[in-house]
Regions:
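Basic, flexible linker segments flanking DNA-binding modules
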Residues: 1-67, 162, 220-232
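Mobile-element integrase/transposase regions
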Residues: 4, 25, 37-90, 109-117, ...
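A short acidic/small-residue loop/turn micro-motif
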Residues: 91-92, 102-107
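Hydrophobic "anchor" residues
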Residues: 96-97
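Acidic/histidine-rich, metal-coordinating catalytic segments
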Residues: 125-141, 159-163, 213-218
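RNase H-like polynucleotidyl transferase catalytic core
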Residues: 130-135, 149-168, 182-189
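Generic alpha-helical secondary structure signal
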Residues: 143, 150, 167-171, 175
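C-terminal domain-tail junction helix/linker
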Residues: 149-153, 175-273
Length: 273
C-alpha cells in the first residue's frame, strides 16, 4: 500500500488520513514512517524530474575577432545604494577591450547598441565571431539576441552558477577593481566615466600583459606584436653577443599567443599532451 504508484505523490500523513477515511486502518503514521525508513524511502517519494546538464561552452580563438567575451559589473556611486553599470566587451585572444560603456542602470537596448557599435568599428563580417556572456538579463535580452541573429554572430552562454565559464571578463573586472587608483566610491557618473576612459586606454595600449607574451593588447589585436617581438629578439641577441657569460642560455623574448579558449576543448588537450 505504501509503495503503490497511485500513492507516490502523497505525504505519509495524507495517505494515512485518506485510508482512514475509506475505513481502512493499517498502522499509525509513525509506524508507516518506520517502515519507509527501514528501506530508505523516507525522502521524496514522487518521481523526480530530470533536467539535462547544461552544455559546457567550448570556444577557441586563433586570432583576434574570433571570440569576444562580455559582462556587466557595478561601480559604487557617491551614496549608499547608488551604482553605475559598466559594460565591457573584450577579445579573448588579444585581451583587447573592443568596447565599453557606463550607464546609471542596466538595459538590453544599451547592450545591443554597444555590441552593434563594436561590430561596426571592428569590421566583423558575418559568421566569423562568437560572443560569450553569462546568463544575465541584458545578455539574454530579446534586443541583443535579435541583433546577434541578424548579424550572424554565434551566441554562447555560461552554464548556470558556473563562474569560471567566463574567465576573461571576470579577470578583467578583477584587474580594474584591484587597480591602486580604483576608489571605494565614485563622486559621480562623470568621474567614473573618466576613470574608465583612462584605465581602458592604459590597459589596451600600455599594459604589457603576461598572458600574451608581455605585449600590449592593442599590439596583439592589430598585428604589430610580431614586429615588436623581433625587435626584442634583436636586443637580446645583441646583449648575448656582447657578454654571453651573463646568460646560462641564449635569451629569447616571451612567445606570442597562438590560441586562446574558454573551456579548453578535449581535442586541444589531447594535441597539447
Amino acid at each position: 500500500m505504501l509503495r503503490a504508484p497511485a500513492h507516490g505523490d502523497l505525504a505519509v500523513a495524507q495517505l494515512w488520513a485518506r485510508e482512514l477515511d475509506e475505513g481502512r486502518y493499517y498502522c499509525s503514521i509513525s509506524t508507516m514512517y518506520r517502515i519507509l525508513r527501514a528501506t530508505g524511502e523516507v525522502n521524496e517519494r514522487r518521481s523526480q524530474a530530470t533536467h539535462p546538464a547544461k552544455v559546457k561552452p567550448e570556444l577557441v580563438a586563433t586570432k583576434a575577432n574570433m571570440v569576444w567575451s562580455w559582462d556587466i559589473t557595478k561601480l559604487r556611486g557617491p551614496d549608499r545604494g547608488v551604482y553605475y553599470d559598466l559594460y565591457v566587451i573584450l577579445d579573448i585572444y588579444s585581451r583587447y577591450v573592443v568596447g565599453w560603456t557606463l550607464a546609471p542602470s542596466e538595459s538590453g537596448e544599451l547592450a545591443k547598441d554597444l555590441i552593434g557599435d563594436c561590430l561596426t568599428r571592428q569590421q566583423v563580417t558575418r559568421d566569423t565571431l562568437s560572443l560569450h556572456a553569462d546568463r544575465g538579463t541584458s545578455m539574454t535580452s530579446k534586443p541583443v539576441s535579435q541583433l546577434l541573429t541578424d548579424l550572424g554572430v554565434v551566441r554562447s552562454h555560461s552554464r548556470p552558477h558556473i563562474s569560471n565559464d567566463n574567465p576573461y571578463s571576470e579577470a578583467a573586472f578583477k584587474t580594474l577593481k584591484y587597480c591602486p587608483a580604483f576608489p571605494d566610491r565614485f563622486g559621480s557618473i562623470a568621474d567614473a566615466r573618466l576613470f574608465c576612459e583612462q584605465f581602458f586606454a592604459y590597459n589596451n595600449h600600455e599594459h604589457r600583459h603576461s598572458g600574451i607574451g608581455l605585449h600590449t593588447p592593442a599590439s596583439v589585436h592589430y598585428g604589430t606584436a610580431l614586429e615588436i617581438r623581433a625587435q626584442r629578439a634583436a636586443t637580446l641577441d645583441a646583449a648575448y653577443a656582447t657578454n654571453p657569460t651573463r646568460f646560462t642560455q641564449r635569451p629569447q623574448p616571451p612567445m606570442l599567443p597562438t590560441i586562446a579558449w574558454i573551456n579548453q576543448p578535449i581535442e586541444e588537450v589531447a594535441q597539447s599532451a
